[in-house]
Amino acid sequence: IDNILIVVPPSLVRYPPSRVESIEGNSVTLNCLARGNPRPHIEWRKEGLPLTLDPRFEIRPTGELFIQAVRMVDYGMYRCRATNSAGGVAASTRLVVTGSHIHPPLLITLVLMTSHCDWFKIHRQCG
């Protein structure tokens, strides 16, 4: 009896939303979990190009892209592609990075020193 191999094209079980926001300095994880037979190979690209060899970027065995200490230069379109001998499937997300220099609200207390007569000049005739 011959062995029968059932080939199933990849399908994404978990994928990133169309937009992910992160504050500069935080870490972010972009999901890309695929199923298929044979097991799909996951590849991540940024702006259509393979990811650079940056130690902050890690593609985990689950297909997730982990970016440690996000920087402003990490802003852009990321795409994960799952492929096997039966086909491929992809998902994209835009990573938006906001600055970490968020200033607390400034409270200014203004004290007006006026005489009783000055108050009346504003609101009524002062004698």
Spans of model-derived segments:
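Immunoglobulin-superfamily
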Residues: 1-127
